[in-house]
Amino acid sequence: MKLGINGLGRIGKLSLWHHVSRQFFSEIVVNLGRQVGSGLEDIAATIEKDSSYGRLSTYLHGHKGGRVIENLNEAAGTMTINGVPVTVLREARNPKDIKWQDNNVRMVVDTTGVFKDPTTDAGDPRGSVRGHLQAGAEKVMVSAPFKIKSKGIDMPDDAITTVMGINDDDYKPEQHSIVSAASCTTTCLSYMIKPLMDHFGADRMLTASMVTVHAATGSQKVLDAVPAAGVTDLRKNRSTLNNIILTTTGAAKALGLVIPEMKGIGFIAESVRIPTSTGSLIVLVLNLQDELENPIKRDLINSIYKDYAATTQYLKYSAGQNVSSDIIGTPEAATVIESTETHTRTASLKVNLDHLKSCNIDAGSGPHILEVPVTQAVIYGWYDNELGSYTNMLGDLTVSVAERMV
């Protein structure tokens, strides 16, 4: 089977690395949608070298690895990477105009981050993720969370958000043609929430909050720039080189699509961008209803993660002391739990029963103050937001979907 990759940005390029290493797909067709440099040689150089992960040849075969991109044919737009035939398309940017059918591509991974609304018509002149289906693809993977622009419109029945190993069983090949692999942050967060959800249950999770200390992304500015017309968040135009920048994340909303039980739990998600190229961290804070006879302690939280990590390749449990560069390139790990920094504090939450009357709740007679034991747990989870965590997880999900295509 052939795989199509739309876009050659950070996730597109690293997805190409992943799949030429994995060699599940017989051929790969990459759509750039425009001319690059002086030709195919410059595209090959862009694929070979990476500022965060080094050379493709080293990634594939270690430091003694030789040239892995060969047989360049400018006229045909073809090359061979690690023995895998790769065709580069440089004509169409609108998904509906990409020649997937002409190249016998049945499955496409859209890594542009542009086409995220599955309700947009395939023929939209601005482009739509559905355009890939019109152009001949049967399945489309999206390397970003869905974002429906029009309010009040439900998610189409043929679209689904999944995280490999969390809810990928919800994918139905006969029903779903567009699959979002959520985001790097949602993927990491899923593996921080799921073990605790399985152990405690949703009824004991009172509230949750998280902040992702996130590496810079391509949407940010290298140097300060003048904002475009209509821009409301001026910080997005400030230099990423020397600033800590407050921004937003849709991880809380996307998490509810992956772990539905979280929809009933008050959850706040925030994001801070920092001047590093990759390697990010989630600080998760959970308030859990405790039991006096069996209080929740740090060791219990860590044992839950350690036991869960023994059952899956996607969660790593670390008893060491890591910094962000230690996480870069970590293979197939959605999350690395920094167990040395897990903390818990238990206190009595005092509820004034008189206040419940305004909620039409009969407090009855007796004490007017109810004390409920509550434990606040703080957990740290590392993730390589590019290759190590997200791209590898996306690659596994892509292969999983491909294996179920008839």
Predicted regions and their residues:
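A broadly tuned preference for mixed-charge, low-complexity surface segments
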Residues: G12, Y53-I81, L257-I268, V272, ...
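Short clusters of hydrophobic/aromatic residues that line enzyme substrate/ligand-binding pockets
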Residues: T162-M164, V222-L223, I244, I328, ...
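Short capping/connector residues at structural and topological boundaries
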Residues: N167-D169, S183, K221, T249, ...
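Acidic, glycine-rich segments within the central catalytic cores of soluble metabolic enzymes
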Residues: G201-S277
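C-terminal active-site/capping subdomain that shapes the small-molecule cofactor and substrate pocket
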Residues: V29, I268-V272, L281-V406
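N-terminal Rossmann-like NAD(P) cofactor-binding subdomain of oxidoreductases
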Residues: M1-V222, V226-R235, I369-P373, Y383, ...
